[in-house]
Amino acid sequence: MDTLVQDVRHSLRSLRRDWGLATLATLIVGLGIGASSTVFSVANALLLRPLPFEDPGSLVWIANNEWGRGQQLSSISVQVSHLWDLQNQSRLFSDVAGVFLFDRAGDFTLTGSGEPERLTRLRVTENLFPMLGVRPQFGRLFTPEDVTSDAGAVLLSHGFWARRIGADPEIVGRTLTINNTPVTVVGVLPASFDFTTIFAPGSRIDFVAPFPLNDVTNRQGNTLALIGRLQPGATMEAAQAEATAIAARPYEGDARRNEFVPRLSPLREHVSGGFRPAMILLTGSVGLVMLIVCANLSNLLLARGVTRQKEIAIRAALGADRRRLIRQMLTESALLAFAGAALGLLLALAGTQMLANSDASIPLLEQVRVDGAALGFTVLAAIVTGLVFGLTPAVSLSAVAFRESLKEGGRGQSEGKRRGWMRGALVVSEVALACVLLVGAGLLMRSFFRVLDVDLGFQPRGAVTLRIDPQTRPPTAAQRVAYFDEALRRVNAAPGVEAAGLTDVLPVAFNRRWGMRVGERRASPFVRMVSEGYLRAMGISLVAGRDFSVQDNDAGRPVMVVNEMLAQALWPGEDPIGRSVTLWHPEPWEVIGVVRGMRHLTPEQEPGPEAFFSIRQNRDYRAVHLIARGSSSLANLTSVLRDVLRPLDPNLPMNEFRVIQDIIDKSTSPRRFLVLLLAGFAVFALVLASLGIYGVISYSVSQRSQEIGIRSALGASPGEVQKRILIETLRLALVGTTLGLFAAWILARVMEGLLFGVTSSDWTTFLAVPVVILTVATLAGYLPARRAARLDPVVTLRADPRSGLVG
């Protein structure tokens, strides 16, 4: 212990004398460990830390793969009768609960308590929270009586309770007015349970209501997402086989039972498993960054060790054995590593807070934090980093000390060929690793820009939207149409408005499908209820036929507009205008128009079949969204819309205008999140590599000053000297870039699943990265080369005792 204390004291004195290098090393280690700890915290939240439920490992997501056998699992819903079957017939599930999927954001309006506000409801079966092990912070959970009574029992989300209710614990038992109907608050959910953070990132749930399981809700069709809990000892494979067998049994109830093809997966896999490839890429990237950090610091310590060669040789001559010298130098490295880890921990705290508050729609991202596991990782990273970057200089310098002892002590400024080769190899490795990161970041960045540039089939820029509802609830059909007519009349007459329309579904939102059949041809298009003017307001181009008009109402024949994909599916090679499809309506629905295919679900998903119905003829919607496009700024447009709509409905929340482009941008936030992180790592790696090149070339110039002086004295021009140094710089950069491009070529094939619109061998990226690296390397070597070209040969040779010019 005394020896360790002595080593620490000696190391502190040594680092204090060379405070500039110590500061630079601490900063480099801090940035590296800060990035590593931040990425570990994200990976821990998304993939490693248990979900905030009781025994989360036994929870199972039960999806219906009815519309996509063989495709990736999705949240396709199931029927109430399917839930009953699993509850009553399964031996491997201890419980199965459901979540209603068709409540949309803003379906409900809170009034009578300050400014009207749009609320979003979640409906769940009464047994969901007990099954998950969720306990209320205040009040109680739902009871079977809450499901059947008319009291309107609700649970408030913790966020809504804190934001709107002012965190008042006395809210339990009080009533709120939602959609002009009183509801009773029976409890407040805990902060640890945030449904949207886990299952619907980027959205918001304000209150929860019980979902009844009865014949009425069963006849509504596929409406539920199911979560089950396995019995102790039950396996996923056995549960899958049992659920498949139960779904295949004949059903004796309602003949209109939908098909159920159960697909089971661990709940954790459903929540965040889709982000595993991205997290593996980020983890690998931060590993490369740490290797560059270690190589850079090894180079710094090797350079510093040359100036300490005399000191080390004296200690060896005084009896210090090689093991003691190595331990002393490793102690210095450990101090630098732990100082950097302290800085890195502060950076990780700030980084995780920033990521948790970002708008990236990634499950569990809001729960990213520096916890005990992250602290342990930081300590481990400090230990490993200190050993890795300190071991090579320690072994190399101690070996030199024992070979040279005091004999070469006066030549502390010289550097042997072996150590020079080692420093060059470290720089080459830095350049190669930086090249790999730059190629990966470049491919993802190119993919991201391709996503932004994709033709959506509509024009999101310049359009805003607001959820509107008739004030009378529930409105009659006549009241609803009159309300919508007046809203559209006011908006279309407002100054600066170019087009306005209504729709029940916004872009990049959950939508429903309807099955359609023409002869033997089938299609399941997404459906939208829209008004006249909607196509113009969204910038959707008609390919054939006409748009909806005011005359397309209950008094007229049922009409619809289809997109090119649906037309091709039902009437391939034929003109769809005038064709008809029979649905539930006594009369067939006639096609009056064809529009281009649109990427309404995500910008990355190819357009699929869609059908549009007149909002005047179809009642299958709740509230609708007003969409307006204007010639003025978005701020002026929203101000004008507030002025014209407020007299129509004083209870209409006017602070919830949304920009259509913002909705599209939010859908790309996970990809933007990955691109920004990887680009940051790549830039950091490039900076470290350039520092490494600068350090090696600068040190090479200082150690070869006599050689340069002799060349200058023999007639070499400053330009020739500078050229020679730059060639040495580019040689290191070229070797590193060549190795890095080969490794990047392999990496690019691994990350193909994360790319969009570019190939893994994208020549633009693979050409641009070497240009960037060689340019940066040239700049890094320019200053040392210019200094070498300006050396005075007379002064240089006088400083060399072997030249005979001393004195």
What residue ranges belong to the model's regions?
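Alpha-helical transmembrane segments of integral membrane proteins
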Residues: 1-22, 267-272, 300-327, 331, ...
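C-terminal transmembrane helical bundles of large multi-pass transporters
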Residues: 604, 640, 644, 650-741, ...
